[in-house]
Design a protein with these regions (language model features):
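Residue-level detector of well-ordered alpha-helical segments, enriched
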Residues: 68, 283-286, 394
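Short, highly charged low-complexity linear segments
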Residues: 132, 170-180, 214-217, 398, ...
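Low-complexity, intrinsically disordered short segments enriched for Gly/Pro and polybasic residues
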Residues: 286, 397-403, 453
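Eukaryote-specific, intrinsically disordered low-complexity regulatory segments in nuclear proteins
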Residues: 384-387, 400, 404
Length: 453
């Protein structure tokens, strides 16, 4: 009705601007009568709504039946959307705040939905500042609600709150919301990931590092600063082993699939003025874990283990996206993998993660893409890894990597089997030499060494 009134008012104004000769008197009268009728109808509707508020809503929003409470709050949310000029007042929206405390999760969910839609209205900060100040502490508690639907929608609502009023949520409360990225509940985690991504984006330079270059003069990717902040956050969170959860939570962030940027930050030395992009060793370890988790999830199209229940049945579109992701990861990581292995050779667990990347790459690219040199470098590094002190996770990863490289039918199978044979020969020689070395020692030493082997 408001749209129709505005349209009729414009038509009347256009008619009134015409000259007396061009103006149609009967049309002018018709438009005036139509506009007057609409004004009366709107006044009548407003009167009816006012009656409903005073005679029904105020009496029933705390009804003993949760269905009636939900209906009342839902309608209040609709009124706020339809007529914000009238209902965006403290005397009305306070009921939304009070309903956030309802004991029934269905009512809380309806209320959070209504409040979230309210925060999407333009210029809401002018009307809802007092509401936010008063009810924000409980909104933050709802992010930890026992009902997953309520918790998810509460975090999404807080995303809109932070967008409208960036400074209203304290740093301490933001940190608590950030940690929800590691939640076992996927929807809560991804809602928190949206909150984290929005906050990180707001801290990025407006222009971006367009002129930034590494020590050897290579231009930096535009999302280097954002990805560095994500890596730093993951390292400071001290939740090792849950990097896959963070990757899954930040599904909204394209930088998590920017594998070229990961490699750039890990391999390239910072240039002049790039001190903020330098990674500490602990951050490099986390960056590798994030990279591997990102490649795995993007290629497999499945949620991480422990967060998603049963595996998804992939559609034709999913299969095509998997293929494209595998090709993109292969092009980026095949040339870089030997350099990364060399860099982290002293860290067995990190090397094990890097070797597992072979499970999700298209190894035919070594032949099709004429990457023979990269294959030689990889086999050389695998041989170097085998010389390292024994480490269970590392040797498991080595066996998986060699098995993957020697899959029957691969164009590189013969080449890799030859290299594997040489490695096993050297390993057998190493075993025999060690056995001879301890054979002359006391029996208890011999038994201990044999058990280790």
């Amino acid at each position: 009705m408001k749209d129709q009134r505005a349209r009729s008012r414009r038509q009347l104004q256009l008619e009134q601007r015409k000259s007396a000769e061009a103006r149609a008197a009967d049309r002018l009268e018709m438009l005036e009568a139509k506009l007057s009728e609409m004004e009366e109808n709107l006044t009548e509707v407003a009167t009816i709504i006012e009656y409903l508020v005073k005679s029904v809503f105020i009496l029933r929003w705390k009804d003993v039946a949760s269905e009636i409470r939900s209906l009342c709050i839902e309608q209040l949310g609709n009124w706020v959307q339809i007529n914000p000029a009238r209902f965006l007042e403290a005397s009305y929206i306070k009921y939304l705040g009070w309903a956030l405390y309802d004991q029934e999760h269905e009512v809380r969910l309806v209320c959070v939905h209504a409040a979230a839609k309210m925060y999407k209205l333009p210029n809401i900060e002018e009307h809802a500042e007092d509401f936010t100040t008063r009810f924000l502490p409980h909104m933050l508690k709802l992010a930890l609600d026992k009902d997953i639907d309520v918790a998810t929608e509460a975090v999404l609502m807080l995303v809109d709150v932070a967008k409208q009023q960036p400074d209203v949520i304290s740093d301490e409360d933001k940190e608590q919301l950030f940690l929800l990225c590691f939640s076992q509940h996927r929807r809560v985690g991804q809602a928190a990931g949206l909150f984290l991504h929005q906050w990180l984006k707001s801290r990025q330079p407006a222009s971006g590092p367009q002129s930034a270059r590494s020590k050897r003069g290579k231009p930096r990717p535009l999302d280097s600063s954002l990805l560095k902040d994500i890596i730093t956050f993951a390292e400071e969170s001290s939740l090792r082993g849950r990097e896959a959860f963070l990757v899954d939570s930040l599904a909204c962030c394209d930088s998590m699939q920017a594998w070229e940027t990961f490699v750039d930050l890990l391999i390239e030395q910072p240039g002049p003025g790039e001190e903020s992009l330098a990674l500490e060793e602990e951050e490099e370890v986390v960056a590798v874990a994030l990279l591997v988790a990102s490649v795995r999830q993007t290629v497999e199209k499945q949620p991480p283990q422990g967060r998603g229940g049963q595996k998804r049945v992939l559609t034709v579109k999913d299969q095509e996206e998997r293929k494209q992701a595998r090709e993109a990861a292969t092009v980026c990581l095949l040339p870089a993998l030997p350099h990364l292995l060399q860099k982290f050779l002293h860290l067995p667990e990190t090397v094990a993660l890097l070797l597992d990347l072979l499970q999700w790459l298209n190894l035919e690219m070594y032949t099709v893409g004429r990457q023979g040199k990269a294959l030689d470098e990889l086999l050389l590094m695998v041989n170097e890894v085998m010389k390292q002190p024994e480490h269970p996770a590392l040797f498991d990863a080595l066996s998986r990597a060699l098995e993957r490289l020697c899959v029957p039918g691969l164009s590189i199978q013969a080449r890799c089997e030859t290299a594997r044979g040489h490695m096993l020969d050297r390993l057998a020689t190493r075993y025999r030499e060690g056995l001879d070395d301890v054979s002359s020692r006391p029996s208890n030493t011999m038994e201990h060494w044999t058990r280790r082997v």
